[in-house]
Swiss-Prot record:
This is N-arachidonyl glycine receptor. InterPro entries: GPCR_Rhodpsn, GPCR_Rhodpsn_7TM. Disulfide bonds join 94-173. G protein-coupled receptor (GPCR) that plays a role in diverse physiological processes particularly within the immune and nervous systems. Becomes active when triggered by various endogenous ligands including endocannabinoid N-arachidonyl glycine (NAGly), delta-9-tetrahydrocannabinol or resolvin D2/RvD2 derived from the omega-3 fatty acid docosahexaenoic acid (DHA). Upon RvD2 binding, facilitates the resolution of inflammation, aiding in tissue repair and homeostasis. One of its GO terms (biological process) is G protein-coupled receptor signaling pathway. The modification Phosphoserine is found at residue 323.
Amino acid sequence: MTTPHSQAQPGLPIDPHPDEYKVAALVFYSCIFIIGLFVNVTALWVFSCTTKKRTTVTVYMMNVALLDLVFIMSLPFRMLYYAKGEWPFGEYFCRILGALTVFYPSIALWLLAFISADRYMAIVQPKYAKELKNTCKAVMACVGVWIMTLTTTIPLLLLYEDPDTASSTPPTCLKISDIIYLKAINALNFTRLIFFFLIPLFIMIGCYLVIIHSLLHGKTSKLKPKVKEKSIRIIITLMVQVLVCFMPFHICFAFLMLGGDENSYNPWGAFTTFLMNLSTCLDVILYYIVSKQFQARVISVMLYRNYLRSVRRKSFRSGSLRSLSNINSEML
């Protein structure tokens, strides 16, 4: 299916996105924006303002929520692009949002690796439990990852082989749709795959294997059952999030780089990008497990909504009864 904007014009780039993709992207990003904004604003407020005793996990969660919000705030521009069928915000802003597509999972995976290492310390090395309260080291680790990721993302703003040219009619921003355009700089991309996917992935796998071995062989008998249960829930949540959201994205990324030179719409690239973006909402499970304050906030919001519904029902019923009594009085 083609649109007026996707019809070929001599000498001009073609917008390769089907109408079905644009509709799906609009619906998907609208849901992600609404849910993700509420969840992560609440989480950032809870972890930064209401948590009295901060630990290393609290620091990591604050960074996860902040990273999610940075990414979520770019979604309205994507939605407007798909709705209008053209890019009205200029070439450089398009490059920034395209770079953000790779910037987000790079930091997210390292933060998940930090949380995994934290749970390793809590379960396997409880004698170093004091280190879990050393928030200064956690802050330094997070700052280091942000700086390292920014440094390796800046070259994406300087692409010399750009699918979106200034003469495109209508203006396009193919870079935010999927990751196929990144094949122009494969040397940097393979380096990014190693440092921002494989290394944090191996850290997580190593931590999980040692934790499982310790649990199976009874080497964690000194730990409280609640600590074990909480750590196991965190580990399961992290594993599911990595397997569902980040693994397909990076596998597709690698195959696209090893593929041919054709720079066209790739449904798998777009689909795995959707899955990666879904992580901004799935973090709510992690927040809920880690923080009792976040649990209380979510429960209070749900109770307040139930209260409003009950008030509306009562007002509706009372209004109906009043109208019936008025009708009866008029008939009499």
